[in-house]
């Protein structure tokens, strides 16, 4: 939008909220609300305190749209100002600023028949003599002074010349010699809609290296859930091994994954191409990245040289001079370090890390007054500059003041361990290990990484006994919610392992590497941890996931996950994962249900487990029990995971109704089917607009027909024919279930329309035959899937089972029972837990 506002207005309360920000940095604006159907009303109930309408107003800074991102370069600062403010009485705001909101509309006055403009102005402050001016194509139409304020709303109707078009009008509000807000309607025209986003092509289909690079960058920037940038970079390097951009990009990718040695050659290759003709390249990013990588490798003299060469280029000077200053400070070359940091700050005076280092260097050089001024300026610029906060405390001589300052700083840091770790890392970066340890000791939480880092720094200071004690504390800490993820953590945890920490440190480092896709290292580390202490359930659980998903060893996965559950039989998450593994391994529904029945309280502790429990009841024919369990609980679905409990609700009632039909209890069947058509509130879900319920209406027609209610039965059969006759992959909750097409056909048969019926049955068979050998994969833009993604899914195999199921449905419709049975059998051989194939096989 080229306007600087977005808002929402409650016409019942005559009030609303506005967001105002410069559209050059906040171009994207979104208003979202659920619809008024059953599905939307259910989400209103879930997401609001008093079950009223749910509306999202969304804006972003430096982003055009909700899923769009922008880059934040090393040490870069992006600043913006935005205002959230209330307003009232204006109705539909046409333009707004932080000072005022205005509405302007033109319409025929029903009383006089004259064309009239209506102006409404709301101000956020008191303006006693504001001027409101309305102009048309021939000049001023209205000019009046009035008081406007949050309680004095200006409203006026102005009669317009007959030939006035709305776009000829302009309203402006002036006060104190300036314009508060203005608005001129734009000529109505059909806006040009942007093209929808396109999925990335496969690397081999992309023509140029530039496009391969940009696609890889896009996937990285958007942190795509299922696609990786690696194939795009590797394809580019296959075509041109010395490509500068791709070597830099792939080197950075490897470095961010902790593969420092593997990353180095890519930066050196980029430098080789950069200096092919000119020893002093136009852009020296590769030198900077090489310097950073060498720092992680501990080769600091080489890193210093690389940073110095990078500093020959304007774009890399801020970062390079900062790191050179830090490396010089580590060698106690404080004068040199100060020169470097001053040059870094020339490029970005707001670099808080550099400012903190400068204050520390000034203090080291005995320039106390200059250091004090620097600290004061730093804290004025950023009160959350914890390095400067600690420097201020160190410089204070009055013990009472010192304690008060320390208390205030700890209040700002909230005793949140990451704040202390971040600050300690900053100090350690320039060799201030003593300061780093003092910072870590301020946090009173018993958090493992605080002690591991303290030990690492204590060892650097030569305090071996202190380091040993810190390592002992780290190993004995509770591991809950400790998930190291920083590249600096690698060296710290490696040091801990090398110094005898074999129980927990390998576990933490294994987690870090698994997140960074280094699963072989993860498995080795977790196995080391398991050998040191095999009573830690999470280690066995992690190994199970890696064995199944990364090594293809389902037996080892089963062994480890069963061991994990045996160590903590009250861990519902581990039980959920174990059950999903049993499902993958082809355990029968009865076997799985028996394990749930051993301790129902586990399933009751989680919605996802409880829904699986109910599913197993239905699959084992315990429909009444499943229904009782459904009605005895309030469910809380997640967006994208809808449809699970409603499916089980429908299955339980439909299958009970089928039993009633078989035993000629037609009235009872009718009641059950009518109940199935309405979702009770406790399910937490409403019915999606467009849901056809063909299976329910077909069986309801049978129940009514058996009672002699032929007209009502015919209406039900007609309703059961409605819906698309195109089968789909059935991956998402809003996909039409395939058997709805079967019931369309069966309903057409009941209505005597054999041709329409057969066309449905053959469509199911044709789709199955045509797509049987398709390669299955997750759709590029998918952000949420309804199924648990604990263990890797073979979507090609899943697609084949689905196609066999579709062909079975088509043959059921055509009365080819033997063929149908064969296809159902094949579907269940491929996917033993196929729910719908199981239900139809029973019939």
Residue ranges and their predicted role:
Residues 1-77, 85:
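A contiguous, surface-exposed recognition patch within enzymatic or periplasmic domains that forms
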Residues 229, 263, 303, 337, ...:
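Single-residue signature of alpha-solenoid repeat helices
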């Amino acid at each position: 939008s080229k306007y600087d506002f977005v808002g929402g207005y409650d016409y019942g309360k005559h009030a609303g909220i506005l967001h105002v920000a410069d559209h050059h940095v906040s171009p994207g604006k979104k208003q979202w609300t659920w619809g008024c159907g059953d599905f939307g009303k259910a989400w209103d109930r879930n997401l609001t305190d008093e079950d009223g309408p749910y509306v999202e107003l969304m804006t972003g800074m430096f982003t055009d749209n909700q899923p769009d991102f922008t880059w934040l370069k090393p040490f870069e600062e992006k600043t913006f100002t935005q205002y959230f403010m209330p307003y009232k009485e204006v109705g539909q705001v046409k333009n707004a600023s932080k000072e005022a909101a205005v509405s302007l509309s033109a319409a025929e006055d029903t009383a006089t028949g004259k064309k009239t403009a209506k102006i409404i102005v709301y101000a956020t402050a008191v303006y006693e003599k504001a001027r409101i001016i309305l102009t048309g194509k021939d000049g001023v139409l209205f000019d009046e002074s009035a008081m406007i304020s949050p309680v004095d709303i200006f409203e006026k109707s102005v009669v317009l010349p007959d030939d006035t078009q709305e776009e000829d009008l302009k309203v402006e509000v002036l006060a104190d010699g300036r314009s508060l807000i203005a608005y001129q309607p734009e000529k109505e025209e059909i806006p040009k809609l942007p093209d929808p986003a396109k999925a990335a092509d496969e690397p081999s289909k992309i023509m140029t290296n530039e496009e391969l690079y940009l696609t890889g960058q896009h996937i990285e920037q958007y942190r795509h859930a299922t696609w990786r940038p690696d194939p795009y970079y590797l394809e580019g390097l296959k075509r041109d091994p010395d490509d500068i951009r791709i070597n830099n990009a792939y080197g950075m990718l490897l470095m961010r994954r902790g593969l420092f040695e593997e990353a180095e050659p890519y930066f050196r290759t980029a430098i080789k191409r950069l200096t092919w003709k000119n020893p002093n390249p136009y852009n020296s990013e590769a030198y900077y990245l090489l310097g950073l990588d060498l720092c992680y490798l501990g080769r600091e003299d080489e890193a210093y040289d690389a940073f110095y060469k990078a500093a020959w280029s304007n774009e890399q000077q801020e970062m390079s001079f900062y790191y050179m200053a830090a490396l010089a400070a580590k060698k106690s070359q404080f004068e040199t370090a100060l020169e470097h940091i001053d040059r870094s700050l020339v490029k970005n005076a707001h670099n808080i890390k550099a400012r903190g280092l400068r204050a520390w260097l000034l203090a080291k050089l005995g320039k106390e007054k200059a250091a004090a001024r620097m600290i004061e300026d730093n804290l004025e610029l950023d009160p959350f500059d914890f390095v400067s906060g600690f420097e201020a405390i160190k410089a204070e001589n009055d013990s009472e003041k010192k304690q008060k300052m320390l208390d205030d700083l700890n209040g700002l840091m909230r005793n949140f361990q990451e704040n202390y770790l971040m600050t300690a890392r900053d100090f350690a970066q320039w060799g201030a290990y003593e300061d780093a340890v003092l910072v870590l000791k301020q946090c009173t939480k018993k958090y493992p990484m605080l002690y591991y880092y303290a030990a690492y720094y204590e060892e650097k200071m030569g305090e071996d006994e202190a380091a040993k004690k810190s390592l002992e504390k780290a190993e004995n800490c509770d591991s809950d919610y400790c998930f190291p993820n920083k590249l600096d953590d690698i060296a710290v945890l490696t040091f801990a392992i090398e110094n005898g920490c074999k129980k927990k440190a390998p576990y933490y480092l294994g987690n870090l590497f698994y997140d960074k896709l280094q699963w072989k290292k993860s498995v080795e580390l977790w196995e080391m941890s398991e050998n040191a202490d095999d009573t830690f359930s999470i280690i066995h659980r992690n190994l199970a996931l890696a064995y199944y998903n990364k090594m293809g060893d389902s037996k080892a996965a089963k062994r480890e996950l069963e061991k994990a559950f045996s160590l903590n039989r009250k861990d519902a998450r581990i039980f959920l994962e174990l059950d999903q593994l049993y499902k993958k391994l082809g355990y029968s529904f009865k076997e799985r249900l028996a394990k749930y029945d051993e301790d129902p309280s586990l399933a009751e502790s989680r919605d996802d487990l409880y829904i699986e429990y109910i599913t197993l009841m239905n699959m084992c024919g315990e429909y009444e029990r499943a229904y009782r369990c459904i009605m005895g609980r309030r469910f809380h679905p997640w967006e994208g995971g809808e449809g699970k409990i409603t499916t089980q609700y429908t299955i339980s009632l439909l299958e009970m109704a089928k039993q009633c039909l078989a035993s000629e209890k037609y009235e009872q069947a009718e009641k059950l089917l009518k109940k199935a058509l309405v979702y009770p509130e406790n399910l937490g879900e409403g019915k999606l607009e467009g849901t056809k319920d063909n299976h329910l209406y077909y069986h309801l027609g049978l129940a009514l027909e058996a009672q002699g209610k032929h007209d009502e039965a015919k209406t039900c059969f007609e309703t059961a024919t409605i819906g698309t006759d195109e089968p789909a992959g059935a991956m998402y909750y809003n996909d039409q279930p395939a058997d709805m097409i079967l019931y369309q056909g069966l309903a057409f048969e009941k209505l005597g329309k054999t041709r329409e019926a057969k066309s449905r049955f053959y469509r199911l068979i044709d789709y199955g035959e045509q797509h049987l050998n398709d390669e299955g994969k997750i759709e590029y833009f998918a952000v949420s899937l309804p199924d648990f993604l604990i263990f890797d899914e073979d979507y090609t195999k899943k697609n084949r089972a689905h196609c066999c199921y579709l062909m079975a449905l088509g043959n059921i419709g055509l009365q080819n029972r033997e063929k149908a049975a064969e296809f159902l059998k094949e579907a269940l051989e491929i996917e033993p837990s196929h729910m719908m194939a199981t239900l139809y096989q029973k019939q």
